[in-house]
A protein has these predicted regions:
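Bacterial signal peptide processing site
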Residues: 20-22
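A short helix->beta-strand "capping" segment at the edge of beta-propeller domains
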Residues: 25-44, 77-78
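Beta-strand-rich domains and repeat architectures in extracellular enzymes and scaffolds
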Residues: 36-69, 84-96, 242-244
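Surface loop/turn motifs at the tips and blade-to-blade linkers of beta-strand repeat domains
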Residues: 38-43, 84-88, 123-129, 164-171, ...
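Signature of short aromatic-glycine-proline-rich micro-motifs recurring in repeat-based ectodomains
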Residues: 47, 176, 223-233
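Conserved beta-strand position repeated across blades of beta-propeller domains
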Residues: 51, 94-96, 133-135, 180, ...
Length: 254
């Protein structure tokens, strides 16, 4: 065997390995929050959805049978600016804004409730399965249903367009709850989890795990009083809260 033949035999396996390898996924970032301040949350709020409106007020969607509501309030003064109560047959869930309108999910009723700016209900739409979290990418509404799947919904008709399976390091991220769309990412609460997950909604890949250990949760001892509620303020700043919490936490993600 010639020298060139021997060299080809040695190099060939390496070449095949190189050709068949796939690029490794980028590593998941591990971030945390810094608490910048607090504000009062309206009392008796089983928080299911939270968003900042164009006037820097907060929209709050709450749950529980017979107690669910949609409310606009000022985080600076704590004043309620508008409020509507859901019919007792609905358990309220996630909310999001689409122009001058607001959509609110219901848990098991398969109904999305549409409101005008003054929180007057103007329409309804139906969907299959449960409703948990909701946010607006600018093109689609992203909806969670407690699984590891994000559902892409039409912002006008609420018809389902497509779905994306969410994974963390290749494994399904189950129990996705409240959602907040920010730029090309979606920030998600996961039920019974003190982390927040930043997700690429096009691929479903979790790009960052954000610890909220800097928030003192020691007073919230009821198992149901979990972290739930993300509202983007600007840049890397957010309002965070939870179910039946008394406070909103103004945080910076870093």
């Amino acid at each position: 065997m010639s020298f060139l033949s021997r060299a080809a035999c040695i190099l060939l396996p390496c070449t095949l390995v190189a050709c068949s390898s796939t690029p490794a996924e980028p590593e998941v970032e591990h971030l945390s929050v810094e608490v910048l301040g607090t504000a009062s949350l309206p009392p008796n709020s089983f928080t299911q959805g939270l968003e900042t409106d164009p006037d820097s007020n907060l929209l709050l969607g709450t749950g529980q049978w017979g107690e669910s509501r949609l409310e606009r309030f000022s985080p600076e003064t704590g004043d309620t600016l508008a409020e509507t109560r859901l019919d007792n047959r609905y358990f309220g869930e996630g909310i999001t804004q689409t122009g001058d309108s607001i959509w609110q999910l219901t848990w098991k009723s398969g109904q999305a409730l549409k409101y005008d700016h003054d929180l007057r209900q103007v329409d309804t739409a139906t969907y299959s399965g449960e409703g948990w979290g909701l946010c607006n990418t600018g093109e689609d509404l992203l909806m969670s249903d407690g699984s590891a799947t994000l559902r892409h919904m039409d912002p006008e008709t609420f018809a389902e367009r497509s779905t994306t399976d969410v994974t963390l390091e290749g494994k399904p991220l189950e129990d996705i709850n409240e959602l907040e769309c920010v730029g090309e990412s979606v920030y998600a609460n996961v039920w019974m989890d003190d982390n927040i997950y930043r997700i690429d909604p096009s691929s479903g890949r979790v790009t960052a795990v954000i610890s909220t250990d800097a928030i003192d949760k020691s007073r919230y001892t009821n198992p149901d009083d979990v972290l739930n509620g993300i509202a983007h303020i600007k840049d890397d700043e957010f309002w965070l809260t939870g179910k039946r919490w008394e406070e909103l936490f103004h945080v910076r993600v870093r």
